[in-house]
């Protein structure tokens, strides 16, 4: 094994030991609401997924609270849906008023009609494209999420939900 490979393996082991596997974070509806409010005020946020080894980023606008969890919505016909099924680990970023939020976590699919209906009822513009009873609409909620709100002029605020 060459020196570069040994260094990479040592760094990976150190990260694994210090960070551990993805730990379970207790749901926190208050913190989920704080993240959702930032996303709503920003208007547009960017969702990053992975397709194979290629990162994929696209704009999103849906961010709602249902049963105390932060939900987003997409269509089952989209590439992002297939990417999330293969690898549910994501990062979201939004910017407003000189501050930004980054949210990392898992997106868990929720195909229940009541979850989809809640999302669509809160986002009337989606009704022309989606219906809670169609075969396309899907909502996801964040699990084991960590959010950081930061700026260049103040200390970052990190919270979990």
Where are these regions (language model features)?
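Extreme N-terminal tail/first-helix region
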Residues: 17-41
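Positively charged n-region of N-terminal signal peptides that target proteins for export
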Residues: 1-4
């Amino acid at each position: 094994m060459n020196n570069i490979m040994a260094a990479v393996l040592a760094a990976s082991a150190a990260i694994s030991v210090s960070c551990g596997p993805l730990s379970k974070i207790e749901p926190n509806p208050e913190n989920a609401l704080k993240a959702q409010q930032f996303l709503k005020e920003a208007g547009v946020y960017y969702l990053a997924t992975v397709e194979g080894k290629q990162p994929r980023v696209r704009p999103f606008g849906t961010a709602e609270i249902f049963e105390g969890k932060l939900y987003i919505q997409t269509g089952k016909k989209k590439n992002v849906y297939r990417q999330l099924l293969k690898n549910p680990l994501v990062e979201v970023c939004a910017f407003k008023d000189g501050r930004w939020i980054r949210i990392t976590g898992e997106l868990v699919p929720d195909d229940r009609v009541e979850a989809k209906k809640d999302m669509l009822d809160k986002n009337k513009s989606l009704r022309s494209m989606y219906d809670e009873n169609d075969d396309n609409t899907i909502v996801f909620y964040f699990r084991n999420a960590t959010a950081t709100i930061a700026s260049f002029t103040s200390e970052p605020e990190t919270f979990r939900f």
